[in-house]
Structure formats: C-alpha cells, structure tokens
Amino acid sequence: GELSPTLYYPVLGQEGSEKQAGDSVRFGFRVSMTDKGWYEAHKHAVYDIYGLGNSLALKHTTLPLYKRMEAIWDYILDDSLSFWRTAGYKGLTIGAQDYLGGVVEADRDAMKNSDIGASWMLASMTGDPRLTEERLPYMRNFKLMQQAPAGDPNHGAAMGQYYLWKKQKFVEEWGDHIEPIGITYYTLMDLGNILLFERDDSLLRSGFRAGAERLLSLQQADGGFAVAYGKHDGKPLFTDLKDLRPTFYGFVVAYKLLGERKYLDAAVRGADWFVRNAVDKGAFTGVCGDARFINDFA
C-alpha cells in the first residue's frame, strides 16, 4: 500500500499561526511505524513519545479529596453555578440544569442532568436536606419522565437527553430518533446509579427493567445494534454506519441489578461483537448524536 501523511502547521488560532506574506515556517515531525497493529502504535505514542507513564511521578496534588467533594457540593447547591431549574411536565415538577448549547428545537430552554450517581452519592454521604429534599426528588422525576411510558412504541427508551420547558417535550441533541446507547446511558446507567441508593424505589426499578428489555429487543442476532431508530416509525437510521460504541454495557448494569442470566448472555454477545468490529480494527463511532456521529470526544 501507499502512505500519504498530511501535516498541518501552524494550526489556525494557536500560537505561531499569525503570519505575514513572505514569512518562513520551521517545524519538525515524527513518523513511527509498526507491523504489530494499531494498539502497539498507540501505546508507543502514549508512553514513549508523550511520557504518560511518568505523569503520576511528576504530579503534585495540592487539593485534598474532601475539598474536591466540597466543591461539587457547593456547585450542586449554588443555582448561579449549576443553572438549576425546575419545570412542570405531565403534572410533575422535574428538575435539571439549564443547557444553553445547541439543541434541535430549543429556544434557550433546554434542560438536562449529568452525573446522576455523584448527586445521590453526595446526598448519601452528607445527609444534607437541601440535596435530599430540594434536588434529588426533582432529578428523579426528570429521569422517570424522560423515559417512554408503557403503551408507547419506544417504551423503556430515553426519549431524549434534553427537556425543552417552553415546548414541554424531550428531544435529542440533533435528530428525532432514539439510540440504543441512549438507553444504556440515560436509562440503565442513570437509573442504575440511583437504584444503588434507592433500592426499594419500585417505580425506578420498573423503569429500569423496561429499559433493559427495550435494549434486549434491539440487539441484533450477531450481538451488535443499529445506530439509531426513528421515534415515530421505528425504522433504523444511519444504516451506512455501524454502532461501534459500548452499547452492550447496559446489559452489564442490568445483570448486576436484576441478576438475570439473559442480560449477562446479551452483554457477552455484544462485547464479542464490539471487540471484532471496533477494538480489533481501532475504529469507533461518536456518541453525541451530532453531525452524523463523527468521531467526537467520546
């Protein structure tokens, strides 16, 4: 085969990128080659070139763990930092953070929750009534309402990461669809984290099981998944792409909490498929649901 490396320097907007006509540019580059596969090349770059293995020896932590926990605590309770908002939905008060980034149909009214487990953990550790009474009940309601209810064709799936309080609807960031990995993240992992602390919450457990069953129904015979499905017609979308994402992990969570063998078997099928199609090839698909699932930060 042929190699055709492409180099860009300087990067626009970064140091050294402002040039005048006639200026000269000097830069160096390194080419590393191996016949041992992408992972060995990756390790070489990480450890031999960038020296990541020495980072802990060079690190001097000055902020103790309890100070970090206090910072999270303050952040959650300070509305000016967390952009906390409550809103009505189907007779319930739901709570989340304002999200002012780009969301389809949003009019600066998108809300979402992140780090669900951290919030419940902090409340469990501190017993702070401001958390247990003023935050968690409304975050719980948000998670319950985010999920498609019984009777809906998408029952068990998260209907969108974001709630638009002006339109009173849940939406995805970009697109009118549901994603199997969205079930893993926003149903199984989020509800699973809450259930670690609220084991007797029957509504949450019922919603969790519905999510696990929905994910199971979407797994293909070879262990993989479609990237997304239309909300209204249930047809697979982005069929030119493979779901090269750890969607199968939702089954691991389901098995841990529900203890049923079918979820473990599904996790193994999914993991085997993921290794064959993603890990062995050094390939992945982005998880943000943006720009046709480009290789984003996730």
What residues fall within each predicted segment?
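Carbohydrate-recognition beta-sandwich/jelly-roll modules
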Residues: 1-213
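Extended amphipathic alpha-helical coiled-coil/heptad-repeat regions
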Residues: 142-286, 293-297
